[in-house]
Curated annotation (Swiss-Prot):
The gene is tstE. Residues 1252-1275 have a biased composition (Acidic residues). Component of the TSET complex, a heterohexamer composed of tstA, tstB, tstC, tstD, tstE and tstF, which may act in plasma membrane turnover. tstA, tstB, tstC and tstD are likely to be the core complex members with tstE and tstF acting as associated scaffold proteins. SUPFAM superfamilies: WD40 repeat-like. InterPro entries: Coatomer_complex_subunit, WD40/YVTN_repeat-like_dom_sf, WD40_repeat_CS, WD40_repeat_dom_sf, WD40_rpt. Residues 56-67, 1328-1340 have a biased composition (Low complexity). This is TSET complex member tstE.
Length: 1340
């Protein structure tokens, strides 16, 4: 039995292109929205008022060439008239013009005006519907609506135009069905008022969007669907599930019908033909998208919709008929000089047309049941079926009001069906007895038939009908040649399309509160392939929420619908696809394939797979597929359709290939047609044909490093194990399994865990164990360990295990297991303890039984596939899965992953009865998943940072990283790989081009790339600063930018980038910071300039005094500033060695270490986060008898800075808690210091081991000075030395307040700031006496 299922789903954006404005999605502007439109709106209302007053006075105005109002049959001409009343009126493009039409109607249109006819009581009414528009007022799609419109009602479907009449405004909704007559309209009902245009307009705006396709059709040969919406035709590739092309027509027209004209040679190529609502025919070449010709209708005022159409098979000729028409219009595109003509002969309107698939025969049927056969060579009718006296149920044919005609794909017979269900099947129409009825009967009794099509391969036809319950059904019917009747086919059960909610792809928050029901009205089937779709139409009971004018404030219009969704169906060969199908061998990648340089790009030589008939191989390097065994492995002569006598139907389920011994194992289901029984069997065969073993078995697996094979018996209670060798397969040994086992899976674990069993009876996964417990040396390790001594994983009662994959790392001796079930994916350790898992989403709409389809280990990242995406997940359970790429086809089974693409097995959409596997590849980017997986390892799998860095460098060098997400960059910065993160982000040219200067600045700032950050910051600052008359938003942005610049300048100072900091503070006019930097750089010119500016301002006396003190300094020393460093090796203090100190975020003046007089060694653990030096952690101090410098260099040094300008700046600018009491710069001790530590100090006082006395800087990732402010202010700072000036010693040794630094004026190499600090400290002693001095810790 076959089954109908969804094979693809097309989703197209419901948005208007920028190049045109379609009337079907006109913006309905309700109110005075734009200030610049007030005058235009006022002018329009004046014109409407004038026309309304003149409506009863200008019924028959004379024709005029240059008048303002034209009436009668002539109307006004296009050159002069502004308003046309009656037929024929026109107008300039910049004015309001009436469109053409007959009668006394008034038409107000945009541009050339709306078309249609109407009476003198309608404005823009009639066939085509008029439009009111204003060119130059936000395009030609602006519409004014009256306020007094309570609701909108409908009698048909979604619409496309808005027109104005005497009772208000109507929104016209055009029919999507070819069987429904003229388009209906949604009337915006309002009471008749004296002036419908004088009301105040509310201030609201809505978009009228289409939510269904106007028409659909398939390519004659390729798997391509053409879908029309508004004036667009979208080309949708069913295999790749993507839109591959788009065509446009005039924006004022709407496409209503599509049909393809198949060609059989270069002279007669395939054409795509479109009928518009206005009656124009467009012809394209779909391969080149070139417009071939445009054909206008015979009568310009004929606005009737097309009811039926058909195309010649091998000639570009189209036949169609319009509503209530008795003629067939013929358009021959082959003869370019010919005009459309008509075939006449029917007495009643034509109901159906069908062309013979191979011959020049056309069949047509009218509403009175008359069937005529035409010869298209001479356009003459040679058969007329009017007499049904020989048929006993002739009277029933008269009860049908509509008929359907369909030819069998080869032309063997013609099916004629009435809407009542009576069906007549005529044989060969060119035979001697063409009127012979070879079969007849009633179909779909008690139902209303909507559409009939014939399957392109199977001998059956599909009927779409509406059942008594009101739901649509799709049934299949075939001819019983023995009894000459028409019976329902047992091959395909009745299918009820699940399309009543075509907006199911939207979330519940995006849907309108009330949704119209979407009904299928016709079947659209592929001419040669196994695809079909359903043309949809909205039901007649559309509520007011479809209106652009919602009934209440909580209702949502259809402007929220931004996509159109359409399902494409196919007929599968089986009820469901087995999860292990397609049958392709797995090539797992060893650990380190991408991480280690020597393993990268070692491509596998070939991939072996079973295509359903042959064993083949796929070469990844060139994409060539070849047969490995010439003889077919599996042949289904019954074609899967239940015929063929005693033949068997086979379906492969599992395929394994052993590369070492060049043999494969195949598990397949064999269905006996004669016995009506199904068995599961196995086949073991080598490529040379020397080994060929078959038998009964439900599952198999290679175990013991692929040296053995285990076959699971049919009942799941027997395991048959054989040893493999180059000579063949040994005899099988049988082992009893208790309880019943469902499937078996291999493991890389040693010892007893050689097999992993899935027991559905117990709903668990268990390992095997040794049968002979008394003899561990025995290798019979196949007993089920139901007690769980080795580990057990309990599953849900209805959970089924499909696939298990292992990843083993010899470096960390870890084994990780990934388990794929029908409900979730589980990652466990070697004892089946869950590390991470993801569940399938609730109520997922999939044709297969499982949401997940396959899994594959890529280093420490697990890749898995769904029906739409390739995803990845890591070993951290707090990270959500992320997509890698979309999948064009489904379902697929991953075979292997290469650095630039993935290779997978895929079952193509084939003719029913065939089961075929193909191997394909798809380009993907795997850099992100590799990096995230490596940086998201759990605690029990840890690598050294140097190894991680080498792995990351190898990945980046070998793989493409032109596209990488922000999540990866943040993860790298989080793990201190800032340099790598910035280099990646800087090389992403595509991504960089889309970022603003502010975003680039933030990215460089985060990555500690100060020069690049300053460059981008300057660009953004210059851009905003030149804006004249900025608004409030721009002012807020500028203030925020200044804050970022201030913080960035401070950080540049902390990192030693003084020139960059100076550039920032110059833009901000931060004079104190500029003076600080100038003194640090010994830049006297800058100090003079700062002083001059301060004198002009006259508001900063402290700054002036500081400048004077510095400039009055007589001794001028050379500039010698040692920037902050990460590491200070063991050193001897000299007269030329200066060290910078940090207070909060500000670095103070460098100090010479020889100026320190005394120090205090602290004997307790010291923390830089202490509130002050008088805290409890600093009470145990030794007397200051030790002289500076220390002899062993094994202590950190804590000093307090003198009262310098820097301390003044730090205190003055400390408004955001930038200052801490103590900070530290580290130094690495020498090996001699470490050796003497245990002898000099007692480590027991610090509650730690000797190896933890000093900081280990081996893990520092960056060599730049950006990490200078990363201190060791924690409990690991075991011993520190506090310095206290001798002149300020108090009786209490724990009270440390300040430090005196001696000046050495004779030392010209000493930094000038050391001396300046002492002099400036005397400048404002009175000002600073009440200011607490920050304490700075220097760790040498």
């Amino acid at each position: 039995m076959l089954k109908i299922g969804i094979c693809s789903s097309i989703t197209i954006s419901n948005s208007i292109s920028n190049s045109y404005h379609s009337p079907s999605t006109s913006t309905v502007v309700v109110g005075n929205q734009l200030q610049q439109q007030q005058q235009q709106q006022q002018y329009v209302q004046q014109q409407l008022q004038y026309q309304y007053d003149s409506l009863n006075q200008s019924q028959t105005s004379p024709n005029s060439n240059d008048g303002n109002i034209g009436g009668g049959s002539g109307g006004g001409n296009n050159a002069g008239s502004n308003i046309g009343i009656g037929g024929g009126g026109g107008g300039n493009n910049n004015n309001i013009g009436g469109g053409g039409g007959s009668g006394g109607g008034v038409n107000i249109g945009s541009g050339s005006g709306g078309g249609g006819s109407g009476s003198n009581s309608n404005i823009g009414g009639g066939g085509g519907g008029g439009q009111l528009g204003m060119n130059g007022m936000n395009g030609s799609n602006m519409l004014l609506i009256n306020q007094n419109i309570p609701t909108i009602k409908s009698t048909d479907s979604i619409g496309s135009t808005v027109s104005i009449n005497s009772t208000g405004v109507s929104l016209q909704y055009n029919s999507l069905s070819s069987t429904i007559g003229s388009p209906s309209s949604l009337s915006l009902l309002s009471p008749i008022i004296s002036n419908p245009f004088s009301s105040t307009l509310p201030n609201q705006s809505y978009m009228v969007n289409q939510i269904l396709f106007n028409c659909l059709c398939f390519h004659p040969k390729s798997p391509i669907l053409y879908a029309a919406i508004r004036n667009e035709v979208h080309f949708y590739d069913i295999i790749t599930k993507s839109v591959i092309g788009k065509l446009f027509i005039d924006p004022t027209e709407t496409i209503r019908h599509l049909i393809t004209l198949p060609g059989n040679s270069i002279q007669t190529p395939t054409f795509l033909l479109a009928f518009t609502q206005e009656g124009v025919i467009y012809l394209w070449d779909p391969e080149t998208h070139k417009l071939q010709t445009i054909v206008h209708q015979l009568k310009l005022d004929d606005k009737r919709p097309i009811t039926c159409k058909s195309a010649a098979p091998n000639k570009p000729v189209i036949f169609f008929s319009k509503n209530e028409s008795k003629d067939i219009v013929v358009v021959d595109f082959h003869n370019k000089g010919s005009s459309p003509f008509k075939l006449k002969g029917h007495k009643k309107p034509i109901s159906a047309i069908a062309h013979h698939p191979a011959k020049t025969i056309l069949a047509s049927c009218s509403t009175d049941g008359q069937l005529k056969i035409w010869d298209t060579r001479n356009n003459m009718s040679f058969l007329n079926f009017e007499e049904f006296s020989s048929y006993e149920n002739t009277r029933n044919i008269e009860h049908s009001n509509h008929y359907f005609l369909v030819f069998e794909p080869t032309g063997k017979y013609l099916v004629m069906t009435g809407s009542s269900g009576l069906t007549l099947v005529y044989g060969d129409l060119t035979s001697q007895n063409p009127q012979e009825v070879i079969a007849n009967g009633f179909i779909c009794k008690g139902q209303n038939i909507l559409s009939i099509v014939h399957h392109p391969q199977l001998p059956l036809f599909f009927v779409l009908s509406i059942g008594p319950s009101g739901y649509e059904e799709l049934s299949s019917w075939e001819i019983n040649n023995q009894y000459k009747t028409i019976v329902q086919s047992p091959l395909i059960p009745t299918f009820i399309p699940e399309i009543n909610d075509s907006l199911s792809y939207l979330s519940k928050y995006s849907k309108p509160l009330t949704i119209p029901k979407f009904n299928p009205v016709s079947i659209v089937i592929h001419p040669t392939k196994n695809y079909f779709s359903l043309q949809l139409e909205a039901s007649s009971n559309i509520s007011s929420t479809i209106s652009p004018y919602p009934s209440n404030i909580n209702s949502q219009p259809f402007s929220s619908i931004r996509h159109i969704n359409q399902n494409i169906y196919s007929i599968n060969s089986y009820d469901h696809l087995n999860h292990s199908f397609p049958l392709v061998s797995k090539l797992p990648l060893p650990m380190g394939f991408f991480f280690e340089p020597e393993n990268t790009f070692n491509y596998p030589s070939e991939i072996t797979f079973f295509d359903g008939t042959y064993v083949k191989s796929y070469l990844p390097l060139n994409g060539i597929t070849k047969k490995l065994i010439d003889t077919p492995i599996m042949v289904n002569s019954a074609s899967g359709m239940g015929s063929g006598g005693g033949e068997d139907i086979s379906k492969g389920k599992k395929f394994l290939f052993n590369n070492e011994f060049q043999l494969f194992a195949l598990i397949y289901d064999s269905f006996s047609v004669a016995a009506q029984a199904q068995l599961s069997k196995y086949l073991i065969m080598d490529l040379q044909g020397l080994v060929n073993q078959q038998g009964d078995g439900s599952d198999c697996v290679f175990i013991g490093n692929n040296q053995q094979i285990l076959i699971l018996g049919l009942d799941g209670k027997l395991a048959k194990v054989a040893t493999l060798s180059k000579q063949g397969v040994s005899s099988f040994k049988n082992f009893t399994l208790v309880p019943r086992i469902t499937s078996v899976h291999s493991t890389p674990l040693g010892g007893n865990k050689v097999v992993l069993y899935f027991c559905q009876e117990k709903s668990c996964l268990v390992f095997s164990k040794n049968v002979n417990q008394s003899d561990p040396s025995c290798k019979d390790n196949y007993m089920v360990d139901i007690d769980g001594d080795n580990g057990i994983l309990q599953l849900q009662p209805n959970e089924k295990v499909f696939q298990i994959e292992w990843q083993s790392d010899p470096k960390s001796s870890q084994h990780i297991c990934a388990i794929l079930t029908n409900q979730r994916i589980i990652i466990t350790n070697s004892r089946l303890r869950i590390i991470n898992q993801i569940h399938s989403p609730p109520n997922h709409h999939q044709s297969t039984s499982s949401y997940f389809q396959s899994i594959f280990w890529l280093e420490w990242t697990l890749l898995y596939t769904t029906s739409t995406h390739l995803m990845y997940m890591t070993l951290q359970n707090n990270q959500a899965p992320k997509p890698i790429s979309t999948l064009s086809i489904s379902p697929i089974i991953l075979s292997t992953i290469l650095p630039d693409r993935m290779i997978f097995g895929y079952q193509g959409l084939q003719v029913p009865g065939k089961n075929e596997t193909t191997v394909r590849c798809q380009a993907i980017g795997i850099l992100e998943c590799l990096i995230i997986g490596l940086l998201s390892l759990p605690p029990f799998i840890q690598y050294e940072k140097k190894y991680l860095s080498s792995c990351l460098q190898n990945i980046v060098q070998k793989l493409d990283y032109t596209r990488i997400s922000k999540h990866v960059l943040d993860k790298l910065r989080e793990r201190s790989f800032t340099d790598l993160a910035y280099s990646l982000s800087n090389d992403m040219k595509i991504s960089q081009s889309k970022q603003s200067s502010l975003e680039k600045f933030r990215m460089a700032w985060i990555s500690k790339q100060y020069e690049a950050a300053n460059r981008h910051l300057s660009i953004e600052f210059n851009r905003i600063s030149i804006i004249k008359n900025p608004n409030d938003t721009e002012k807020r942005q500028f203030n925020k930018l200044k804050e970022n610049m201030r913080d960035f300048g401070r950080e540049c100072m902390n990192a030693g980038h003084y020139l960059l900091a100076k550039d920032c503070f110059q833009k901000l006019s931060e004079h104190i910071y500029l003076l600080q930097i100038s003194i640090l750089l010994n830049d006297r010119d800058s100090v003079i300039a700062i002083k001059r500016d301060a004198e002009l301002r006259g508001d900063d006396h402290v700054l002036l005094a500081a400048c004077d003190k510095y400039l009055n300094k007589q001794n001028k020393s050379i500039n010698k500033v040692n920037p902050p460093v990460v590491k200070i090796l063991p050193w001897d203090p000299t007269a030329t060695t200066n060290v910078s100190m940090k207070s909060g975020l500000d670095y103070l003046s460098p100090i010479n270490l020889n100026s320190i007089q005394r120090y205090y060694p602290i004997s307790l653990p010291f923390s830089g986060a202490s509130a002050s030096l008088n805290g409890g952690k600093h009470k145990l101090l030794r007397p200051p008898e030790e002289s500076w410098p220390p002899e062993d260099f094994k202590h950190s040094v804590a000093i307090t800075p003198p009262r310098t300008l820097m301390s003044l700046v730090a205190n003055r600018l400390s408004t955001k808690s930038h200052m801490s009491s103590t900070t530290t710069l580290r130094r690495s001790p020498s090996i001699e210091n470490i050796r003497t530590t245990s002898t000099t100090f007692d480590s027991s006082k610090f509650n730690t081991d000797n190896q933890e006395l000093f900081d280990d800087d081996s893990d520092d990732d960056s060599d730049s000075g950006a990490d200078a402010d990363v201190d060791s202010e924690n409990e690991e700072d075991r011993k520190l030395v506090m310095t206290v000036p001798a002149s300020l010693q108090h009786n209490d040794n724990s009270s440390l307040t300040n430090i005196t630094v001696t000046d050495n004026d004779s030392n010209l190499d000493q930094d000038i700031t050391s001396n300046t600090g002492s002099d400036i400290a005397d400048l404002n002693d009175t000002q600073l006496s009440s200011t607490p001095t920050p304490t700075t810790t220097l760790s040498s």
